[in-house]
């Protein structure tokens, strides 16, 4: 019967799928599928695919022809030398030349043919058997010079003067955008003065279409006429009108691509004809950096054309057009209501003038409405892209901040002290080691959170004044341990040194002579380590006394149980003398106390005399008849002190009231604090 005019190829289906005219862009998955089919048939794959591609090139759809040319490039790169021989055959080259010389073919397709021939020429340059492609490229370039894209300019670095000029132009544009009172004459005069100092940019850097070039020339001619009229009207301005300089990176924010550009070097930006590129900065003399669809790269200026920003008149005109479109919404709703009513079927539409008028008025706004839809759809895409960039930048910023926070946080924690700030310590005393965190310290020390001061503000002020007059006196650093509530109340207004039981001072009832031989091994204020040992002398008054005693040593109390260096020494809470003369010699067994840790004396440890004072001149001993459940009368005996602590009643109500002041012999102690519990004697009763 009848035979088809076109040969049938087993690859027609996959080639048709990869070059479908309904595709919006190249589908590289389909293109690679075609390459796989060709490689699976080494004998006839190249011949069959050329047959299928030739049929697609003869179609009248521009999209199909463009996708087929893209497929040719991929086949040449992925299917070996046999495929390259088929592409460089005389029949296929003739098909390409026929397509480029056809007047019915779109110009973009002709430009694509020339681009494919140029790329194949560079690829086949080393193979003389494929020179037919190079000959076709030279012939087409000679006959159709308008199809060839301009050559890429060389990448010359911008000099410092050019960069400074661009910066000055940017500042000038910002100043002019903020100024609303400048006239046209002064604006042109400013440009003339600037052009005399700085060389203008060459217009040949940008590519222009013929129609757009004519429009620009007409606009420039009109601007010159308008400038001359303004200069004639303004008698103060004698400068002639000059042409505005070519837009630079300071004045251009967007450019439009006039040719397709495929990036051949790292850092270049690929784009297609008609793409709108956002200008970021100038990198080289004829290259700018821009952003397109989330990609950032450089592009040559001769491949793009600057887009002029709309003038205020154009913006106002566009707003009026949008307003006219939205004003027709009422007529559209009215027309829809009439056509949707029950009487619409009985109406004679051809004779109803109201319906005809409404219908024709709504038809007129249809093109404007479609234009507005495209405009705001593009703006939506731009805003979505901008939001994605912002989210990405914010994520990177947050990650960098999180990575840097542990570094600075760890350094701050390592350099700090648990005792708090150093500004609140009294003068002459080290503040960093005076009171560790969690332990009560002297008043005015910020390192004792959670503990109220144990002295009234008046006495505290007096003590601070005394301490300021005293020489620096180091305090033994304390280690972390837990104290009983009674020990928390036995704070002294004088520095106290604790020693480890018998290793520190031998026996409990040591004499004044033994106490005078104690050494102070901690020296310096800044924690500089031990210094020379200084024995405590028996004479001298290096350590002052509170003003209650007039600066001298007070008389010893008459309490029968006051040991010279007993726990009732300076700083300990006092009890009324003779209140417990008949107290039992052993405490109750229901409240044992934990033993003191190593390095700290038991509560019965004697306190050392202050540095530079004799034992006789030390502060009076305030005593309690029972210390850790042991009568104080037994403390004067020569019984060895062991490291075993004696249990005491662990009852907060047994604590003596806080010391409100110092009192000498013969004076009564202060009254107990209200709501502080019964006196200690009630417990044994």
UniProtKB/Swiss-Prot annotation:
GO molecular function annotations of the record: phosphatidylinositol binding; ubiquitin binding
Gene Ontology cellular component list: endosome membrane; ESCRT-0 complex
Give GO BP annotations, semicolon-separated: protein transport to vacuole involved in ubiquitin-dependent protein catabolic process via the multivesicular body sorting pathway
Its record classes its membrane topology as:
Peripheral membrane protein
Where in the cell is the protein located?
Endosome membrane
Pro residues bias: where? Answer: 668-685
Q: Where is the composition biased (Polar residues)?
A: 182-206, 499-522, 627-645
Q: Which InterPro entries match?
A: ENTH_VHS, GAT_dom, SH3-like_dom_sf, SH3_domain, STAM, UIM_dom, VHS_dom
Q: Does the keyword Transport apply?
A: yes
Q: Where is the composition biased (Basic and acidic residues)?
A: 144-166
Gly residues bias (residue ranges): 539-553, 562-572
The record's Pfam families line, in alphabetical order, gives: GAT, SH3_1, VHS
Q: Where is the VHS domain?
A: 18-148
Here the segments flagged for biased composition (Low complexity) are 212-241, 432-448, 457-498, 574-584, 591-604, 646-658
Keywords carried by this UniProt record: Endosome, Membrane, Protein transport, SH3 domain, Transport
Domain spans labelled UIM? 165-184
Q: Where is region (Disordered) located?
A: 144-168, 182-247, 432-685
Question: In the UniProt record, does the keyword Cell inner membrane occur?
Answer: no
Residue ranges of the SH3 domain? 250-309
Q: What is its main location?
A: membrane
What does this protein's UniProt record list under function?
Component of the ESCRT-0 complex which is the sorting receptor for ubiquitinated cargo proteins at the multivesicular body (MVB).
**SUBUNIT field:** Component of the ESCRT-0 complex composed of HSE1 and VPS27.
Q: Which family does it belong to?
A: Belongs to the STAM family.
What's this protein's name? Answer: Class E vacuolar protein-sorting machinery protein HSE1
Protein source organism:
Yarrowia lipolytica (strain CLIB 122 / E 150)
Name of encoding gene:
HSE1
């Amino acid at each position: 019967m009848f035979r088809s005019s076109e040969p049938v190829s087993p690859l027609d289906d996959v080639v048709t799928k990869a070059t479908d005219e309904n595709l919006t862009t190249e589908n590289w998955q389909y293109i690679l599928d075609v390459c796989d089919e060709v490689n699976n048939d080494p004998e006839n794959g190249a011949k069959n695919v050329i047959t299928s591609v030739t049929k697609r090139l003869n179609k009248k759809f521009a999209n199909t022809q463009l996708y087929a040319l893209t497929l040719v490039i991929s086949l040449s790169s992925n299917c070996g030398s046999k495929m390259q021989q088929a592409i460089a055959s005389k029949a296929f080259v003739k098909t390409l030349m026929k397509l480029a010389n056809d007047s019915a073919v779109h110009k973009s397709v002709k430009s694509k043919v020339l681009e494919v021939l140029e790329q194949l020429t560079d690829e086949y340059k080393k193979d003389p058997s494929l020179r037919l492609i190079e000959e076709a490229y030279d012939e087409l370039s000679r006959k159709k010079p308008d199809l060839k894209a301009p050559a890429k300019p060389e990448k010359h670095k911008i000099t410092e003067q050019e960069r400074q000029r661009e910066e000055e132009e940017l500042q000038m544009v910002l100043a002019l955008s903020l100024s609303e009172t400048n006239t046209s004459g002064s604006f042109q005069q400013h440009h003339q003065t600037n052009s005399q100092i700085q060389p203008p940019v060459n217009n040949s850097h940008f590519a222009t279409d013929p129609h757009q070039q004519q429009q620009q020339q007409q606009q420039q001619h009109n601007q010159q006429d308008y400038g001359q009229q303004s200069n004639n009207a303004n008698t103060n301005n004698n400068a002639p009108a000059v042409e505005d300089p070519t837009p630079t990176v300071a004045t251009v924010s967007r450019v439009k691509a006039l040719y397709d550009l495929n990036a051949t070097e790292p850092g270049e930006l690929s784009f297609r004809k008609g793409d709108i590129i956002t200008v970021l900065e100038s990198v080289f003399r004829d290259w700018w950096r821009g952003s397109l669809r989330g990609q950032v790269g450089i592009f040559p200026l001769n491949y793009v054309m600057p887009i002029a920003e709309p003038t205020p008149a154009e913006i106002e005109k566009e707003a009026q057009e949008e307003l006219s479109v939205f004003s027709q919404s009422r007529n559209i709703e009215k027309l829809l209501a009439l056509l949707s009513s029950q009487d619409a079927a009985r109406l004679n539409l051809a004779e109803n003038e109201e319906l005809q008028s409404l219908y024709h008025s709504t038809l007129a706004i249809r093109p404007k409405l479609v234009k507005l839809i495209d405009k705001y759809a593009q703006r939506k895409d731009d805003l979505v892209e901008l939001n994605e960039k912002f989210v990405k930048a914010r994520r990177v910023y947050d990650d960098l901040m999180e990575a840097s926070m542990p570094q600075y946080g760890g350094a701050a924690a390592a350099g700090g002290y648990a005792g708090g700030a150093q500004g609140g310590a009294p003068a002459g005393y080290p503040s960093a080691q005076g009171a560790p965190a969690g332990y009560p310290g002297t008043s005015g020390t910020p390192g004792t959170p959670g503990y109220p001061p144990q002295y009234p503000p008046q006495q505290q002020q007096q003590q601070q004044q005394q301490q300021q007059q005293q020489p620096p006196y180091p305090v033994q650093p304390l280690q972390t341990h837990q104290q009983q509530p009674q020990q928390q109340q036995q704070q002294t207004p004088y520095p106290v040194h604790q020693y480890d039981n018998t290793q520190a001072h031998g026996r409990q009832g040591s004499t004044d002579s033994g106490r005078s031989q104690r050494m102070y091994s901690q020296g310096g204020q800044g924690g500089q380590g031990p210094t020379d040992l200084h024995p405590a002398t028996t004479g001298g008054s290096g350590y002052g006394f509170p003003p209650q005693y007039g600066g001298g040593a007070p008389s010893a109390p008459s309490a029968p149980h006051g040991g010279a260096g007993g726990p009732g020494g300076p700083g300990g809470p006092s009890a009324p003398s003779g209140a417990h003369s008949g107290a039992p010699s052993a405490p109750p067994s229901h409240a044992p106390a934990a033993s003191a840790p190593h390095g700290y004396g038991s509560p019965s440890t004697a306190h050392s005399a202050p540095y530079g004072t004799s034992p006789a001149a030390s502060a009076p001993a305030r005593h309690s008849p029972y210390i850790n459940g042991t009568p104080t009368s037994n403390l004067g005996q020569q019984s060895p002190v062991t490291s075993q602590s004696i249990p005491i009643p662990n009852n907060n109500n047994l604590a003596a009231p806080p010391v409100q002041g110092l009192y000498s012999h013969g004076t009564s102690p202060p009254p107990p604090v209200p709501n502080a519990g019964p006196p200690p004697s009630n417990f044994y009763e």
